[in-house]
Amino acid sequence: APDGMAMDEAYSFEWDVAYLAAVDAGDRSPDLWHRLAEKPFSPLYFFYRQSPRKLIAANRDGMVRADDPPVDMSGMAEVVLTPRGQLRTFLSVPPQRETGGGPWPEPDFRALLRETGLDGSALRPAAPQWASPVDSDRKAAWEGTHGTGDDAVPIRVEAAAYHGRPVWLAVLPPWM
């Protein structure tokens, strides 16, 4: 698309099936489903996808989803948010061809971390463990908890950058 503009986009709400399975396996209290709104994670998420080409899903109903079609073409991007607007995943596919040489600036993940709604002062730097889903030359990670009291959940935040620009950030609860 000219000037980096998206040619196609899609957005929708989807159920977080992995989260629902984890909650169902771990909490058998009778009021569980009524208390989900109070828990730090949501069983529902919003995704937004954009692409420099038409998004064509491979699934039977033809609906674009968070994972269909794959986010694998330069210029494609995806954002996943909670119903409250907190960032859970950011993904931006970098160019397929190298454009000049470094050195590249250190990536600044602070803006993305702020958008997660997590308490940044409670996150501790950690060694990255996850592979970035897109090409990257720098990675970072943090550990902490999300929520309070009995509902507190240990989390990891993993991030990656390409040539100084963030290309991936994911808030990863233990069931991921």
Regions of interest found by a model, annotated:
Residues 1-176:
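Soluble extramembrane regions of membrane proteins in the secretory/endomembrane system
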